[in-house]
Structure formats: structure tokens, C-alpha cells
């Protein structure tokens, strides 16, 4: 089965965490989001994969190669300018041809049963099937209103609280029949939720919504990223995929997720952190370091064999705190 993986994101809101990494390579407790997604695709039977790239495409190409180390066949489409989600997929028409295919975002952690989603789509005759997920804070997502048969009647994009009538959000994971893509113009920025789906509804093309079990989290903000990292440590997402290639930019994995002191056998040269049990390859704090600033407490202790990082955070709102933490660490290194 075929899948298109949208991996062109830059991750501006995560810049204090990602640096120059494309957002799909952001690590979740030592494993890039993209590695986890490719492992999920393989386990779900989607072994023919096309990734759409835009920001620093060579970084992802070097990291993933031809996909053989993940058990998939991986090819790429590179955008010189962003085309929107639907526009990027339309540019892959030679890849999907006349086959139904999966679309999945490269910057969300997920454990859905994608094969079940695919089978429900094929049995329904829908033009598009949308994976839905309940979210207690749905304001930043698109809400989906369905009829009793599960077909979509309305999309409400990023509502305010008075307009929240459901907690089911659009995850950006779709099964699409090729006829739906004929509504997308070529070489024109075009989005699924804002552009294509209203056209399909106006044309009476059926869109099926399927509430999914499992785990899903869009890591687009520091707060969501922090929450997702803790969810991984709590076992809500599957463990590190086996045989995933190691990235030189990825953080050293924690062998004991219950520990807040994370050892790394090679002394780091630069270091960034957001939450407990995470350390990115980085700085050499040879003499040790202790920082206590507001809700953050950080300790880097000197050791003959290892360097360690300990972080305690009393709040999940990490944007300003991460920047402050990095500033303190840089001052110490001067």
C-alpha cells in the first residue's frame, strides 16, 4: 500500500528546541518523529512511501536514505516553494496513480491502526476518510461534525470555545481516493481542510470521519512537545523502533526512562534540553554546572566517564523557559 508523508515543515515555533533541524527530525526521547512514523507505516503495511520535502530536504534524505533500513521503499518530492498540504500531494500524482493512498503528517506522534482506517475507507466508497481523535484542548485544531452514519457535514477550523460542539479533531491523517485529487489545481497552493474539503462537500463527494483509538499528538508547539515527551516516557507511545538509523543530531537515548539523570558515554559538546530524560549531543561542561532559575532546576555534574543532565520542570509551558535555560548554559560556557 502507498503512503505520502508530508515532511516539509520547518518548525518555527520549536526553533529554540530544534535549531536547524527540520521538524520531522525532532527527537522524542532520543528517536526522531520521522523514524517512529516510518516504523508505524511499515507495521501497518504501507511500505511504498513518498515523502514531500521543503525545508532542508537534504537533511532528511541523508537521514532516511532509500528507506530500506526501516523496511519501506522511500522516494522523495522536493518543493521549491510551499504548495499547501493538498498541493504537495497533488504533485505526487505519478506516485499514487489510480490507487487509494494514505496521507500522514511528518510532525505528529501517532500509534493509530492505519490498516483499519484504510479498510474502512475502501468499504465506504468515500472520496476521503479522515482520522479523528478526541482532544481536551481542541482550539488549535479543526473540529469535525458528522452525521449518524459517520459522514462529515462540517469542518470548523480553529474555533473559539463558544463554537466548540465536539472534541473530535482532524488529525491530518487521511485515506484518499484519486478522484478527490482531481479537484486540486496543479502548481497552486492548496490546503486540504481550508480548500479541498469544502469543495468536496459542495460537490456531494462523501467524506468519512473515523474516530481512532491509540495515541496522537501534534508536536507543533513547545507545550505540545513537552507533553508528548512525557507521554512517551509514560509508555503511551510505542518504544524505540528497532534498527532505526542513528542521526548525528539526535539526542542520546535514556536507557532508564524513570531516571532524571541521563548518562551519555561520550562527553557532549553542546547541550539543549526541554524535559526530563532528554539530552541532545552538545556541550562540554567539564567542571559541572548547576542552574536554578524559576521553575527550572538543572544540574550537569562532572564525571570521569560520563556527563549527565538533570532537569526538573514545574510547568509544561517551555517556550520562554527553554530560551532562558539555553541562555544560562551559554553564559556558563563562556
Task: Please describe what each predicted stretch is.
Residues 60-62, 67-148:
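Conserved beta-loop-beta/alpha segment of the NTase-like Rossmann-fold superfamily
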Residues 146-149, 302-304:
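Short acidic-glycine loop/turn motifs at beta-strand connectors
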Residues 100-102, 109, 115-122, 135-138, ...:
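Catalytic-core segments of class I nucleotidyltransferases/pyrophosphorylases
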Residues 243-334:
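Phosphate-binding and adjacent anionic-ligand microenvironments
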Residues 1-61:
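N-terminal glycine-rich phosphate-binding loop and ensuing alpha1 helix
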Residues 5, 51, 103, 128-131, ...:
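Structural beta-sheet core signal
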